[in-house]
């Protein structure tokens, strides 16, 4: 099995290390040709506006969209979830107008849990995965779903309230958090099970 990890900005190295620990071939995706013959794609956390601009500048948007529409699973973590969402607003600034792939029927609020200093670790329960330890760093909240998208897990937070932190639509997973920081393999195993189907 070959899993591509978008390697333009952000914490892609941590995802690659975990995939290799799981015995999966991980490939860096930096240009459209790197998407050939992969069984799944991870879009990592980082700065969503920067990653989106780099996706656009490197002409990766349409090839990624075609890949996902063809049935190849994708997992977006934190900034990756923002890029997968069809609707994006910022908790403070409102409408962002930022580039996004817009593949999932979800609406997200950027920085929903506060700024960098409001980062936190949590144990959450996700449908299909179970309990997992994860990190929230300037994370988005999933506040709306429609169509075939469904929320897999929620968190109760003093700033954001009760909000979704994971959503799935077919082979697409949007995660508000960073599973790679804690290294909880259950989330990766779930994603890899989608790639094996």
Regions found by a protein language model. Name each.
Residues 36-38, 85, 128:
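Short secondary-structure boundary/hinge segments and terminal tails
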Residues 7-9, 30, 105, 112, ...:
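Residues at the C-termini of beta-strands that transition into short coil/loop
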Residues 43, 76, 175:
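Redox-cofactor binding/interface segments in oxidoreductases and associated redox assembly factors
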Residues 1-57, 62-70, 185-197:
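N-terminal beta1-alpha1 cap of cysteine-dependent amidohydrolase-like domains
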Residues 110-197:
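Amide-donor transfer/coupling interface in amidating biosynthetic enzymes
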Residues 26-27, 74, 172:
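Hydrophobic anchor at the start of a short beta-strand
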Residues 48-124:
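Cysteine-nucleophile active-site neighborhood
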Residues 8, 79, 177:
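Cofactor-binding loop segments of dinucleotide-utilizing enzymes, especially the Rossmann-like FAD-
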């Amino acid at each position: 099995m070959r899993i591509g990890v978008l390697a333009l900005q952000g914490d892609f190295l941590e995802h690659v290390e975990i995939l290799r620990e799981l015995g999966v071939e991980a490939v860096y995706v930096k240009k459209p040709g790197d998407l050939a013959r992969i069984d799944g794609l991870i879009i990592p956390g980082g700065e969503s506006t920067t990653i989106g601009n780099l996706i656009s500048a490197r002409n990766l948007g349409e090839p990624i969209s075609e890949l996902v529409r063809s049935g190849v699973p994708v997992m977006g973590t934190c900034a990756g979830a923002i890029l997968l969402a069809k609707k994006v607003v910022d908790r403070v600034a409102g409408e962002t107008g930022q580039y996004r792939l817009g593949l999932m029927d979800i609406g997200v609020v950027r920085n929903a849990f506060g700024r960098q200093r409001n980062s936190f670790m949590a144990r959450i329960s996700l449908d299909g995965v179970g309990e997992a330890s994860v990190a929230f760093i300037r994370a988005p909240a999933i506040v709306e779903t429609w169509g075939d998208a469904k929320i897999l897990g929620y968190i109760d937070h003093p700033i954001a309230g009760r909000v979704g932190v994971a959503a799935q639509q077919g082979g697409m997973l949007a995660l508000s958090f960073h599973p790679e920081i804690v290294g909880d393999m259950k989330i990766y195993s779930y994603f890899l099970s989608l790639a094996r189907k």
